[in-house]
Amino acid sequence: MSEKRAGKVVSVTDIGSNFVRMGVYQAGKGGVQRLDYLEVPLRLGHEVFATGRISVSTVRQLSSILRGYAQVMKEYGVTEYRAIATTAMREAKNRAYVLDQLRIQNNLVVEVLEDGEESSLVYSALCRSPLLREESLLSYVGTGSVGLAVWRQGAVDLSCNLTIGFLKLSEMLRGQEELTARFYRVLEEYVENYFQRVALRLDGQTFSRILLSGRQLDSIAALCGGREEKGALVVERRQLEEMYALLKGMNASTVAREMQLSEEVADQIAPMLAIYRRMLDITQAKKLVAPPVNLMEILAAQLLLPAEKAAFEQAQRAGADAAHAERVRSVSVFLFGKLKKLHGINAKRLVLLECAALLHELGHRANVKDEAQAAYDLIKSSYIYGLDDEETMLVAE
């Protein structure tokens, strides 16, 4: 049995399309420290994308997995948790029934992340990469959805979400794999149709690189002969094109055998490459850059790290005067305490005040002539750990 730890211990459970994962975390000197990690395969995505529903037997399996995780949470002395579900649960026609069963059987409240929220969490992590440029295309490629966003002048300038992903594509084309030429032709047509909206919205904009996060990127980088740069995996466009051309002559069974991949990964590798290939084509980007991004650790940070710390880090990244921002924050906290009998505002509002103090100079580099408006625009479109949309707007205002 694991020993209970000193300090706050939290857990994050992720009910995904292929696996049910749980991590146990604690705040450490370098940020979030993972104490334990569990992963059990469960093919929710295959079931939902094929039938539209989650079967009763699968709900039982899921409930059993979560009971085991609850025991681990108890052993570690977890005091706060967050349980999320993504694309498969989001698209299940009977998701309300499934969530209700988990609440009754497991006493667990599961939050279904919508497309935009899932993408925003990933973008917040991608924006911390040292490989981010002044103007970059950010992307999140999931099992059933793809998110894209343009990062410009310290904020997300344009974003869109597509209801397509590599697992969903794989399920849609199941049965075509043996007809190799037809399979790839239909695959490319599907991907091109879904990305038409992206091409129209980008309106000819080009980028030198795409910063992205997604499943199996380590497998793709290894297959394509990618390299590591500043902690990120980098795949050149030429490498990806060469690998895609090689795969076009193989079916999934041959790919698994020749590339020494599992059958599951071999099934999904062609849709993955087709999506990345289309993104590179639309943007004329020369490379894919995949910094280490972990959605569960991002959510754990929300539970463990104070929002004002995240705001301070964001201000530093934007080039604000950190010492000045800290002085403004200190004065704000002092005045808040002295005037508490008059204003009667709660402690949560103090956190928002600290965030506003730390971020008030955020717009200086973006627009010297109208710093206030620039700061407002940057903050309202940002994601700050620990704050919801309404609280972020209050900070911006």
Region locations from a protein language model:
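Short amphipathic
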Residues: Y37-V40
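Post-signal peptide N-terminal segment of secreted/secretory-pathway proteins
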Residues: E80-Y81
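N-terminal basic/disordered segments at the start of proteins
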Residues: E3-Q33
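Active-site-adjacent helix-turn-beta-strand microarchitecture at beta-sheet edges
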Residues: G142-S145
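Helical "lid/coupling" subdomains associated with nucleotide-phosphate turnover
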Residues: G7-V10, V24, E47-Y76, M89-V98, ...
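Beta-strand initiation motifs
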Residues: G30-L35, A155-D157
